[in-house]
Amino acid sequence: MADIRQENADAAARVLFDAGFNVCTATVDVSSRTSVQALVEAATKLGEVSGVIYAAGVSRSQASPETILKVDLYGTGLVLEEFGNVIARGGAGVVFASQSGHRLGPLTTEQNALLAMTPVEDLLALPMLQLDQIKDSLHAYQISKRGNSLRVMAEAVRWGKRGARVNTISPGIIITALANDKLKGPRGPGYRRMLEVSAAGRAGTPYEVGTVGALLMSPDGAFIT
């Protein structure tokens, strides 16, 4: 269990420990290759890495476009690459993207390929990701989340060569502390409108998202990648 803040990792670990799981914690900055490599090293010292669940990220209301691209896009590519180098045969990964990535307008075939295949260290240098092309934090967030889905599609091939799988989940509005704050804030009417016109007609719960993640990580999801 890793987080950029040790206290967050410890709090989550206590919940799991009280439910009967053995948990180790670490800090990680996903925008730093050195930090991610240290996390991979710590994980491999515990044994085979058979599962990776990645939910790190910052939202448009929390950060600048530069930070969003560095954490949500570059960081995701970095974690996929580094853990993809050690994932065990039969292992699986899940990356939490967002429905926001699917609300971005269509990209060109070339842009899709660049987001999917550009070496991680060259990602943020792409012309399409420069600040004169990124309109605001929402645009940075949407293109990062679109990039997450594209990146996982490409990584699924590489992970597959190791006998492992990787998928993304792009949830809609899920009721968390952050979502409740947004519903009560200035953007609340827009979020409530999204819920009203959605097919489900309501927000989701973390448990409901978790059941999808459990399927993708389990042998029952062995053909899904």
Descriptions of predicted regions:
Residues V58-Q62, R89-R162, P171-T176:
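Catalytic loop of short-chain dehydrogenase/reductase
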